[in-house]
Regions:
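Charged helix-capping and loop-helix junction motifs
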Residues: 7-14, 40-48
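Short, small-residue-enriched loops and turns at beta-alpha junctions
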Residues: 34-40, 66, 90
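C-terminal helical cap(s) of enzyme catalytic domains, especially alpha/beta-barrels
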Residues: 71-113
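Conserved anion-binding
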Residues: 1-30, 34-35
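C-terminal extensions of enzymes
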Residues: 108-109, 117-132
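Catalytic cores of alpha/beta
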Residues: 45-82
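Short secondary-structure boundary segments
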Residues: 32-33, 62-63, 85-86
């Protein structure tokens, strides 16, 4: 589907992925519009459509609601990265909890000081108040 899920396409997701592999793109952001924002987990069926020999990195998105969803997505060899907005925007200290859990599971993440993140939260909260 395209056009926000309103227009059904005549080709499958797998066919579309093969077409993407032929053009100069760096990665594929594979988002489930059915799961996006639900927090119910990634749509695992989408992963089944990714060819085993697919040459581009896949970023799986749409549906993460807890750090376990990241782990489930990243444990699949066809997935190179995961994404979320819902989890970080609406659920307390999810960024810190998720990063700690993923690092404990042995996933390779950029290392940065969580105190800096906290200070940035304060900065952006202050900036929002100033703009009101």
């Amino acid at each position: 589907y395209t056009e926000n899920g309103t227009l059904q396409q005549s080709f499958s997701l797998q066919e579309w992925l093969y077409k993407l592999a032929e053009v100069p793109v760096g990665e594929v952001y594979l988002n489930s519009i059915d799961r996006d924002g639900t927090g119910q987990g990634y749509q695992k069926e989408l992963i089944e459509y990714i060819p085993a020999d697919f040459p581009l990195p896949i970023i799986l998105a749409g549906g993460a609601g807890k750090y376990q969803h990241f782990i489930e997505g990243l444990q699949n060899k066809k997935v190179d990265a995961v994404a979320t907005a819902h989890l970080f925007n609406f659920i307390g200290n999810s960024l810190e909890v998720s990063r700690i859990a993923l690092l404990k599971e042995g996933f390779n993440l950029a290392k940065w000081d969580m105190n800096i993140c906290e200070s940035l939260k304060g900065f952006f909260s202050h900036a929002e108040k100033l703009s009101e």
